[in-house]
Amino acid sequence: MSHKKVVAISESSSDEEVPVAPPTAPPKKRQRKAVEEPRGHQAMVEIARQATAALKARGDPGSIIVQTFCDQTVDVDKEGNVIFTPAKQKSICNKSGSPLASVASKIFKASEHKWQSAMEFALKVLNAYQVDHSKLTLLPDEGTLECFKKAVQAYITTSKMHVTYTFTNQKTFLHVAGRLLLDFVIKAAELAPGVNPSGCVVWQHGCQSSLMCLHGSPMIQKEQLVEMDVNSENAQRALKENPEKTKIVSNRWGRNVVQFKNEDAFCCSMDVNMSGGNFSGASCGMFYTDGPKAIMAFQQIMAFLKACYPSMPNAESHLLMPLKCECNWNSSLPLLGRQTCKITPFSLASASHIDKSEVDDQKMLATLNNPAMLVFQCCNPVYRNSKAAPQKNCDFKISSVDLVSCLQIAKQIWLSTVGERPPVKFPEFHWSDEHRYQTTILPQGQHDDDLVLF
């Protein structure tokens, strides 16, 4: 009897090669998420912190916080989480122990809510044009103004608007438009009644047929004598263009000079006894070298406003003008010299070559019939090739018609972003002693926390 051996062959003893598993791929690196800008409550808390820091830097008391209408203080922790903290109720008691309503506390809470409302208006304008609002504080400082200036420039670029400047530089145009948008924000939220961030006023000029100064008094016609070096370019131009008003004389040092006699100059009534180019301490600082040209410039803006707004009742009696330039826009300290923007009439010599019969637009005819224009400049401008002046100065320069365009563009931006009509409320100009020409500025010390100087 034969025995059969059964041999079990395992699968591992097969002659076939065992397939090797492919190597595992290295783990993919996670893409870094772009740092998102804070939004919502986080953005408002960040702006409130910056505003508080700006107040502290200026030496003003108080702080800005974000608070809900349920009296909850909004804050953000280190991890970026929003925290709502119930406000502590404080009661002010008199000697008898009965609680008294704190008027100051109510006003402060109301101002907090208005500040939040103003911040919402501002973010609507800035976010519509992707403007970085990291420096926005709603205070009249350079950071806040720069935000609104960028919004104006973005609106002009995106709308493909072509703005023609007449005696105006673009920097001043954006500066004034930014001030107007800030003014809309403050007025819409009723944040600071009585404050005028625009720096512009409405002036009842009364210059329909005669010139009036900022005092509201008639300006006095005064002869002006200007002496120039006989070899200078201005002297040669005066001899060539106005030979009847110029002559060569010897001055008190025995040198030959060109004397220009101007009989059409007008000055403030407070400067009648002052020599040419000087102002008294009671003066408003207004002076025109050419009175008839100044009247023509006033007639031009009156006709221009009437053509733009036929139903405007005060188009021929009032005009919008910037009262402050870049030197004193966000400062209450007086300047050495003039305190208000210098008003100068500029003539449009090229307008005389245009045929009026071919023009039907009343806005254009306003300039063709009155080829002169009011230009608002720095309070104390320093001209090229002139000697250094001690006054603070800037390159502020905008014409009356471009100021109208500036307000129109600011209104368009507000309407397209906020969705409602802007609060156009400018104070009417009235003469005050703070507008007087300052001949002397008293020295002022700087802030120092040390007990002794040295």
Swiss-Prot record:
One of its GO terms (cellular component) is host cell nucleus. GO terms for molecular function: DNA binding; zinc ion binding. The keyword Calcium does not apply. Its main location: host cell. Zn(2+) 1 binds at residues 213, 215, 268, 284. Keywords: DNA replication, DNA-binding, Early protein, Host nucleus, Host-virus interaction, Metal-binding, Phosphoprotein, Viral DNA replication, Zinc. Transmembrane segments: none annotated. It is found in: Host nucleus. Residues 1-41 are annotated as: Disordered. Residues 226-260 are annotated as: Flexible loop. Residues 440-454 are annotated as: C-terminal arm, DBP binding. Zn(2+) 2 binds at residues 325, 327, 378, 394. GO terms for biological process: DNA replication; DNA-templated transcription; positive regulation of DNA replication; viral DNA strand displacement replication. Belongs to the adenoviridae E2A DNA-binding protein family. Homomultimerizes on viral ssDNA bound to pTP. Forms a initiation complex with viral polymerase, pTP and hosts NFIA and POU2F1/OCT1. Interacts with host SRCAP. The C-terminal arm bridges DBP molecules together, thereby creating a chain. Plays a role in the elongation phase of viral strand displacement replication by unwinding the template in an ATP-independent fashion, employing its capacity to form multimers. Also enhances the rate of initiation. Released from template upon second strand synthesis. Assembles in complex with viral pTP, viral pol, host NFIA and host POU2F1/OCT1 on viral origin of replication. Covers the whole ssDNA genome during synthesis. The complementary strand synthesis induces its relese from DNA template. May inhibit cellular transcription mediated by the interaction between host SRCAP and CBP. This is DNA-binding protein. It comes from Canine adenovirus serotype 1 (strain CLL) (CAdV-1).
